[in-house]
Amino acid sequence: MKVFYVTLYLLFVLSLTAKAQDSVKVALVQAHLAWGDVDANLRDFDKRVRSCKGCDMIVFPELFTSGCEMKKRDKEEAVCSKDGVASYYPLVIKRMRKWAKRSGALVVGSTIYKEEGKYYNRLLAVYPDGKYEYYDKHNCFKKGSFSPGDRHLALEWKGIRFSTYICYDLRFPEWSWNH
């Protein structure tokens, strides 16, 4: 079942440096996600990235690889689903690197990451040279669904500094101010 998912990342401009260009062209890429089907979603976003010619930054929705599956019948089903999506993490990074290199843009999106038995809603920011940075969502809306991250991510791209947030983290600006 495909569902239209609306949550977007908001990137706040923190400061401009002397080398900053006049503007940054940002593509906010939205899609009808195939819930839990990482392969189908990656194929779909591959097509969508091709239409982002001339963009400096390409931003995908929260959990763009799988959708945000909040209504599982039981905990076991939810864990099984997260394990499946988290197993794609290396492929997601590889695909985002390809998109960043091909487009020359900074590519930003989040997916599920698993480490030491804990799940994180991880935002990845991938540069055209293949390097990437990340932060894990700090304020998780539903307790127990994801483990909270403990660091903030500010990026500089094309001479402009950005601060990254995933959805609900915007409701807690003091966390950002303190980091």
Name every feature range the model reports, one short phrase each:
Residues K47-P128:
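Cys-nucleophile CN-hydrolase/nitrilase-fold catalytic domain and related Cys-dependent amidase chemistry
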Residues V29-A31, P61-L63, S110-I112, H138, ...:
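Active-site-proximal beta-strand/loop segments in catalytic clefts of secreted hydrolases
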Residues V6-S15:
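Bacterial N-terminal signal peptides
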Residues A27-G36, K75-G84, G159-R161:
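Short, basic, glycine/proline-bearing loop/turn elements
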Residues K114-H179:
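Active-site catalytic loop in hydrolytic enzyme cores
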